[in-house]
Amino acid sequence: MLGNQSADFSEKGEDEIVRQLCANGICMKTTEVEAKLDEGNIQEAESSLREGLSLNFEEARALLGRLEYQRGNLEGALRVFEGIDLQAAIQRLQVSVPLEKPATKKNRPREPQQSVSQHAANLVLEAIYLKAKSLQKLGRITEAAHECKSVLDSVEKIFQQGIPDAQVDNKLQETVSHAVELLPALWKESGDYQEAISAYRRALLSQWNLDNDCCARIQKDFAVFLLHSGVEASPPSLGSQIEGSYIPRNNIEEAILLLMILLKKFNLGKAKWDPSVFEHLTFALSLCSQTAVLAKQLEEVMPGVFSRIERWNTLALSYSAAGQNSAAVNLLRKSLHKHEQPDDLVALLLAAKLCSEEPSLAAEGTGYAQRAINNAQGMDEHLKGVGLRMLGLCLGKQAKVPTSDFERSRLQSESLKALDGAIAFEHNNPDLIFELGVQYAEQRNLKAASRYAKEFIDATGGSVLKGWRFLALVLSAQQRFSEAEVVTDAALDETAKWDQGPLLRLKAKLKISQSNPTEAVETYRYLLALVQAQRKSFGPLRTLSQMEEDKVNEFEVWHGLAYLYSSLSHWNDVEVCLKKAGELKQYSASMLHTEGRMWEGRKEFKPALAAFLDGLLLDGSSVPCKVAVGALLSERGKDHQPTLPVARSLLSDALRIDPTNRKAWYYLGMVHKSDGRIADATDCFQAASMLEESDPIESFSTIL
């Protein structure tokens, strides 16, 4: 019935535009129709179209309304559209546009009729769509959304089994695609976000026969809305899901699913690459600490999308956030190779930071940090402070690698110098203040450490847990246990229940130091109940990084309780606690050390020595196990002189790893005494005595 129903434009000069409408093989200029519209004679204009193009009432009105819309007369277009009984037209079209099977020889003659029916359907649907657009431009957003929704409702009535992949008029498909894309935007603009969510899901789950680009735009818009709208979307309806399919439980999961589907389309060449999609996916996966998944997605991106340097650096950042520092450092080594970008300041700083967390890589990190400092010039000079901070951390970690006392002292001095230099650039950086305080504390400059601990608490407003822990540890090292407990209690009052684990463990150890073992046991029991409740609350969905952030897990609580009972000589309780800890972590040098203490307390020295040696086999750098074996051998050395050199070697090795271990100094003094070296023994006992006066209840390194 209708031929080409689109308006043709041809320019004559700069100002004159002559429009033409074509239908049923007939074309007519719109000059006469527009003149009647200008005079307000809508009915006469409609009659001209009906007579000139052989149209019925709804078709003529639809074309007339579109003409008004194209002319920019939105109010006029609405008046024309209001005169159409669109629902009645839809009902007629529902009968005239059946979903036919692909044409065969018998029904091929019916194809022209089907084409005519689809043209008629498009004309009516386009009228509703343009009415919605007119209302939107006039600021009547809610009305526009309802009109746009009626387009999709009408399509579902006409095509009850969904729009077929073939035999659909292009213009009809274009109208449907525009309406599907417009509806969620209108609901968002009107402020009805739940309707917007429903519209997005309807667009993606119903059969609209959308092209890949249109579908990709809708998926991206929906994902961005879920991530940034602040509206919590309810899970999708189970009725719309295929059995066994994955159902997102919250906004972030649904957004990640959409963005990963989009990336898959990009990789398969089904949609044009959009870099913002990967940026949104990075944000979403970072929110839920799933950067390992992000790295996997980045590895699957087709070559050429990212430069290899950018890919390596982004992968390194993702792996480092996932705790896979070794993989991250290897990627940064490639990126910083002399034939790539050896002076990339950000990559140098990241490499230095990662190396500062591992003693074996600290020397390499020192080189990266020094290169970063040298390259921090001009517009990047503000990053010099970051470079100095990384240099200080790397030097401090390097000082912990077994070396000569002179070299250790030199590295510690240079570490403090670098961190002090960084403070000049970033004097308001709380993290830098904290790290400088810890460096002073590890060197037993407790007065300076206390000052920086208080500065950190002031800088953060007391909102960061590690600041209170640090101050309590410094006070315990100053043997001010009651004050440390007051600080711990104050921190507990200001800390959420789920975050109290490290403070409760600290409080239990303070109780032990003040000879209150009963209260210490009760604190450990409360801590155990808290950790178990937390594990059950989060369930199997709890990520590794989230568990590490708590700093106290169930194994540590059972092990701490076992250590406490061992100090009270409650050996049966120790055995029960160790069994519980062993169920959670089968191999642990610290647990074997406590087991050795248990056997030693029972006067069974062979099993004790075996447990300590097993701990050393498991972790060759375990200082407690080295000291315990050295202590046992030094006791035997009174009767068996040949064991003294072995004990001396083990204790000296322990002191190279941890020169502040007072027990190692004490037992080394005992070895020297048994060996007849009284002067050396005196020096060792004096060192042990001095360290005992500044020994914290937990190592300062536990708060880093």
Swiss-Prot record:
TPR-type repeats, residues: 24-57, 58-90, 177-210, 309-342, 430-463, 555-588, 589-622, 662-695
Protein name in UniProt = Protein NPG1
PANTHER family to which the protein is assigned, alphabetical = PROTEIN NPG1
What is the UniProt domain comment for this protein? The calmodulin-binding domain (CBD) is located between A-448 and A-496.
Instruction: Please give the Gene Ontology molecular function terms for this protein.
Output: calmodulin binding
Which species does the entry assign this protein to? Arabidopsis thaliana (Mouse-ear cress)
- Keyword tags: Calmodulin-binding, Repeat, TPR repeat
General function of this protein: Calmodulin-binding protein essential for pollen germination, but not necessary for microsporogenesis or gametogenesis.
Where is it made, tissue-wise?
Expressed only in pollen and in pollen tubes.
According to the UniProt record, one GO cellular component term is: extrinsic component of cytoplasmic side of plasma membrane
Q: Which cysteine pairs are joined by S-S bonds?
A: none
The record's section on InterPro entries has: NPG1-like, TPR-like_helical_dom_sf, TPR_rpt
Q: What happens when the gene is disrupted?
A: Normal pollen development, but no pollen germination.
Please list the GO biological process terms of this entry. pollen development; pollen germination
Complex and partners: Interacts with calmodulin in a calcium-dependent manner.
